[in-house]
Each structure stands twice: as structure tokens, then as C-alpha cells.
Swiss-Prot record:
This is Beta-glucuronidase. Homotetramer. It is linked to Defects in GUSB are the cause of mucopolysaccharidosis type VII (MPS VII), an inherited disease reported in humans, mice, cats, and dogs. Glycans are attached at residues 172, 419, 630. The keyword Transmembrane does not apply. The gene is GUSB. The active site is at 450 (proton donor). It holds the Pfam family Glyco_hydro_2_C.
Length: 651
């Protein structure tokens, strides 16, 4: 078994272009306003995978120059969704290489005829590398499968008599040592076992590498002079809230800005002018986490109004940004929100479900939030990549605290610490902070999960990466999640909070739950003695197949999962009185992985099944989390199940 040539990606299609053609500037969520419209392109798209030996046929035949159906047979593919589980084709489920999507959209006449209208194509997520054409013209490229990118297509749709546009995407899910997450292409050269050119995609993470258009695709408009970006940071001075804002405008240097902050009743509580300033909010309603306050998740609305006088006449633009006023701080032993100790009792998740894979789905999202609130969870980590923007918006609305993680999972190889990898990781953190900086629910950035941080190049890599993230956003702490030994971890000196994953009596000392308390307590003590920083138990858990029962408990039974959690909780209850500031179970729900003898149709460590039905551990954890909530905050009675009540979901 040998690895292919250094240019493994070349064998699968064009070289990795730089993402310089993606738009610079802001990445505000597309909201409708008096000056802005949007047209969703979700639904059925034409789809075709390039099964040619080199995966080059689509480029050689220029499939983007004509309707995709003219290139050969196509499939109907729902967007958003992963393409892997929708059909019955075994080859497509594990396909690696270029796939092609196409959709024709009819535009409102004003969009195509008004030169004062700017038309933007926005792709919420295309995993992993995407090239975009409109009417056969190349408009954008983007590397990375979890963050949005845009292209201004105004000139293309306003240059002819047509009121429609044909949008074509080529997407490649190949992972290399320099992608995030990393992977390798391994060519099988034994002719007695494998056909010529046979290769496999190796990954270093434990979830399925779903691919496709995972999040909404849409068109939206702005005026040609428009609000491009808004940055908000908040503070508190006694009972006065402080909202510092900075607004960026594109299209003209001559404009006026008015800024209004409205409370939940629509009353203006503060106002200002200009591109930057500070708003003071007397008798402020703070944004509090779920179960930490009787009135959690209070959101103000920041209304920004732009006016400009252009040669063609006056221009105006309006944008409304939800704002939660809160503070975050870290001490040697505490994580503070609004100056009060906050204890994370929550989950790790995945964007994963039957059939849709990682595709965004509103019913699934609402179900998950209902379960989180029922569970008494106040937090989750976006393991192991940024989640959809709509997820973050619901976290803002319902007070669910977020550790926002980059796709830096599986950084194992020395090559993945190269300057090429570091530069890409810096760019990804820039995109992540740009997208999520204004969410009050986001209280900490996580730059990676379980890297080989004991390798020598890890010290410079994480020192640089964390410093860069703090420079982008000085208002939040930064961490990465480790499973390295406390003495060997070269990245830990640079984090603000120690996040540790451990699986005592699961991945070692199989079945011996009696050693958990000693091993876990020793690990906590070693980490704290070395770094004097607060600690989060960022992962722990056990594989459990729903309906398997054994007493005395045996591995994979529901009883074993419960017993393991109980042993962890005994130590957590001791150490949370000292320096442990949180616990996040692995995992919220079962999820799909690559096939292997160690995985029975995916990872079964969920406290819920993949279909969101509870295992016995869910009830154990619910009892614990409501008990923790009773000790740490003001909330409704734990006897009452929590759900999303009377929510219009008008995000």
C-alpha cells in the first residue's frame, strides 16, 4: 500500500486554486428589509458525479458551458442535503472527487433591469472545494466545507435580455494533509488485489465525510451602496449596557449612517450616527444563558440606516442585527458570564441525520432544540466544524451557550503543521470569526479538536493560530480540545481554558469502571497544577446500542453507559467546586461514521439514537442537568418539560 504522487489532488481534477476570487469584506446574514430582497434556491437541483478515471471529464468537456442535462444523465438532488445517502447507488455513497450541481433561477424583472440593484449569490456550505459559474461564466471559488461564500453576479444578470440565470457548481470532497479537516489519498498498487488507479480516502476523524450542498443557497439584493459589515461588542457598567459598533459601507465614500437600538417591544432605547460609536442602554436587560436567569436570552435589535446621494439619485439601505448585551471573562478557576460563574452542562453534537446526512433541516433543528431544553442542557460545542448560521441564531434566541469550533479535527500528520496548512487554518478562523462574531451565544472559540499537539511543530502552530484568533476577536477566550498528555501538550500554554477529552474504561481498561474515579481525578489535578486554568471535560462517554441490556453492566449496553457516566459525575461533582467549569457529554445523538469493524453502522455514543429517541442515559443526564441548574441559576421548575413555545422562527 503506497500513497499516490504529491499532487494527489491533480489526479482528481484541477489544482486547488486559492480562494482569492471569493468576495472580501463582510458576511452578514441575508435578511430582508425595505432595501433588500432574497430568493431561496433550495429544492431539487440537477446533479451528476464525474465517475471518469481522473475525475476530469466535467472540466475537459466544460459541463458548465451548457445545461448539465446535455452532458449526460443527471439525477434530481435535494438542496440542502448530502448527496451520499439520497440514492441507492453504492458507488455514489462513498464517492470521492468532483460532483456537479445545476439550478436555473428566474429573477424578478427589477433585479435584471435596475442598475441600482446589486445581486449576490450566496452558498451557505459546499463541502469541500467549490467552483461556481453563472451562465457559464466563472464567478467564485472557495475552499472549506462549513462556511458561507458569495459572488456579486449583478453584471452577469443585468447584461442581457434574459431574466434567468443558470447556476453551476463543481464540488470536490477530497481531503489532503493541508485541508481542514485533513486526510490523505492512498493508492492501492497491488495489481493482484486492486484494479488500476484504485484509491481510497483516508481520514483522521470519527464521522462520515458527507459532501454536497449542505446549507441553503440563495440570491439576495442590496443597493449598489450598501452596508457591508457590522461589528458589535458589548459591555456593562453597573446597570447600563454598552454597545460599541463599527459599520463598514461599500459602494461610496459619501454616506450618512443612523443607528437605533430597539428593545423587544420595539422601543428605541439608544441611538447614534456615524460608522462607529458607543450606545449606552440604561436599565439594561442582559443576555443570560438558558436556566441561569428567569428571563434568559434577551435580544435587542440594532437598526442601521444608510443614505447616500449618488449620480443616479438617492440611495438607502437598511439592516437589522440582533444584539445580546453580555460579558465573558475567565479567571484561574471560573468562567464568568455577566460577572457570574457559569458552569457548562451540555453536549457535543454533529450535523447528522438519516437520509439528509449533514444537510440543514428545520424540523430536525427544532427537534434538537426541544431535546436540549428538555434535557436541561445550557451549552454545546460545534464539534467538529462550524454549524449552520440558523443554528447559531436559535442559540441566541434560546440562551444556549456555544463553544464555536473550527473544522480543525484530525490534525495528526507532520505535514498538517506546515506553513501551507497554517495559512489555510488562519484564513478559516478569519471566516469563522467574521461570520459568528456578533452572536451573544458564542462565548469561546475552539481552533481544533484532538490534534497531535505533542509534536514539535505544534507549539508554533497553535501559538500563531491562537494569537491570530485573539487579534480577530479580543472579546472572547480561545481554546482547543486536547487528548494529549498534560506534560507533552505543546499547545496548552496558549489557551485560556483547558478542554480535555477522556474515555476511561472505554478505549482502555475496557469494562473496568472501577478505575474511572482515580484516573479522572488524577488527570484533572495534573492539568490544573501545571497550568492553573479552568478545565472543561469536553468529551466523555460510552458506545451504547439502544435496547441492549446487561446486568451486571457490559460494554455497549444501556446499563454500561449509565454506569460510566455516574462514575464521571462523582469526580465532576468534587472538582466543579474547585476549577472544573463544565462537562459536555459525547454525544448528543448517534451519528454516521466510515465503515469499520469498530463501528456498528456509525458511532453509538449518543444519549439519543440517530432518530432522536432517548436511551436510558438521557434520563440520567436530564436529572443531573436540572439538578445543576437548580444550584447555579434562576429558572422554571425542572418538573416542567421545556420546549420552544409559540416561536415564529422569524430569524
Amino acid at each position: 500500500m503506497s500513497r499516490g504522487p504529491a499532487g494527489a489532488w491533480v489526479a482528481l481534477g484541477p489544482l486547488l486554486w486559492t480562494c482569492g476570487l471569493a468576495l472580501e469584506g463582510g458576511m452578514l446574514y441575508p435578511r430582508e428589509s425595505p432595501s433588500r430582497e432574497r430568493k431561496d434556491l433550495d429544492g431539487l437541483w440537477s446533479f451528476r458525479a464525474d465517475f471518469s478515471d481522473g475525475r476530469r471529464q466535467g472540466f475537459e468537456q466544460q459541463w458548465y458551458r451548457a445545461p448539465l442535462r446535455e452532458s449526460g444523465p443527471t439525477l434530481d438532488m435535494p438542496v440542502p442535503s448530502s448527496f451520499n445517502d439520497v440514492g441507492q447507488d453504492r458507488q455514489l455513497r462513498s464517492f470521492v472527487g468532483w460532483v456537479w450541481y445545476e439550478r436555473e433561477a428566474t429573477l424578478p424583472r427589477r433585479w435584471s433591469q435596475d442598475p441600482g440593484t446589486r445581486v449576490v449569490l450566496r452558498i451557505g456550505s459546499a463541502h469541500y472545494y467549490a467552483i461556481v459559474w453563472v451562465n457559464g461564466v466563472h464567478v467564485a471559488e472557495h475552499e472549506g466545507g462549513h462556511l458561507p461564500f458569495e459572488a456579486d453576479i449583478s453584471k452577469l444578470v443585468q447584461s442581457g435580455p434574459l431574466s434567468s440565470c443558470r447556476i453551476t457548481l463543481a464540488i470536490n470532497n477530497t481531503l489532503t494533509p493541508h485541508t481542514l479537516p485533513p486526510g490523505t489519498i492512498v493508492y492501492k498498487t497491488d495489481a493482484s488485489k486492486y484494479p488500476k488507479g484504485y484509491f481510497v480516502q483516508n481520514t483522521y476523524f470519527d464521522f462520515f465525510n458527507y459532501a454536497g450542498l449542505h446549507r441553503p443557497v440563495l440570491l439576495y439584493t442590496t443597493p449598489t451602496t450598501y452596508i457591508d459589515d457590522i461589528t458589535v461588542t458589548t459591555g456593562v457598567d453597573q446597570d447600563t449596557g454598552l454597545v460599541d459598533y463599527q459599520i463598514f459601507v461599500q459602494g461610496s465614500e459619501h454616506f450618512q449612517l443612523e443607528v437605533y437600538l430597539l428593545d423587544e417591544e420595539g422601543k428605541v432605547v439608544a441611538q447614534g450616527t456615524g460608522s462607529q460609536g458607543r450606545l449606552q442602554v440604561p436599565n439594561v436587560h442582559l443576555w443570560w444563558p438558558y436556566l441561569m436567569h428567569e428571563h434568559p436570552a434577551y435580544l435587542y435589535s440594532l437598526e442601521v440606516r444608510l443614505t447616500a446621494q449618488m449620480a443616479a439619485g438617492p440611495v438607502s439601505d437598511f439592516y437589522t442585527l440582533p444584539v445580546g448585551i453580555r460579558t465573558v471573562a475567565v479567571t484561574e478557576r471560573q468562567f464568568l458570564i455577566n460577572g457570574k460563574p457559569f458552569y457548562f452542562h451540555g453536549v457535543n453534537k454533529h450535523e447528522d441525520a438519516d437520509i439528509r446526512g449533514k444537510g440543514f433541516d428545520w424540523p430536525l433543528l427544532v427537534k434538537d432544540f426541544n431535546l436540549l431544553r428538555w434535557l436541561g442542557a445550557n451549552a454545546f460545542r460545534t464539534s467538529h466544524y462550524p454549524y449552520a448560521e440558523e443554528v447559531m441564531q436559535l442559540c441566541d434566541r434560546y440562551g444556549i451557550v456555544v463553544i464555536d469550533e473550527s473544522p480543525g479535527v484530525g490534525i495528526m500528520l507532520v505535514q498538517s503543521y506546515s506553513n501551507v496548512s497554517l495559512q489555510h487554518h488562519l484564513e478559516v478562523m478569519g471566516e469563522l470569526v467574521r461570520r459568528d462574531k456578533n452572536h451573544p451565544s458564542v462565548v469561546m472559540w475552539s481552533v481544533a479538536n484532538e490534534p497531535t499537539s505533542f509534536l514539535k511543530p505544534a507549539a508554533y502552530y497553535f501559538k500563531t493560530l491562537i494569537a491570530h484568533t485573539k487579534a480577530l476577536d479580543p472579546s472572547r477566550p480561545v481554546t482547543f480540545v486536547t487528548n494529549s498528555n498534560y506534560e507533552a501538550d505543546l499547545g496548552a500554554p496558549y489557551v485560556d481554558v483547558i478542554c480535555v477529552n477522556s474515555y476511561y474504561s472505554w478505549y482502555h481498561d475496557y469494562g473496568h469502571m472501577e478505575v474511572i474515579q482515580l484516573q479522572l481525578a488524577t488527570e484533572f489535578e495534573n492539568w490544573y497544577r501545571t497550568y492553573q486554568k479552568p478545565i472543561i471535560q469536553s468529551e466523555y462517554g460510552a458506545e451504547t446500542i439502544a435496547g441492549f441490556h446487561q446486568d451486571p453492566p457490559l460494554m455497549f449496553s444501556e446499563e454500561y453507559q449509565k454506569g460510566l457516566l455516574e462514575q464521571y459525575h462523582l469526580v465532576l461533582d468534587q472538582k466543579r467546586k474547585e476549577y472544573v467549569v463544565g462537562e459536555l457529554i459525547w454525544n448528543f445523538a448517534d451519528f454516521m461514521t466510515d465503515q469499520s469493524p469498530q463501528r456498528a453502522v456509525g458511532n453509538r455514543k449518543g444519549i439519543f439514537t440517530r432518530q432522536r429517541q432517548p436511551k436510558a442515559a438521557a434520563f440520567l443526564l436530564r436529572e443531573r442537568y436540572w439538578k445543576l441548574a437548580n444550584e447555579t441559576g434562576h429558572h422554571r421548575s425542572a418538573a416542567k418539560s421545556q420546549c420552544l413555545e409559540n416561536s415564529p422562527f422569524a430569524l
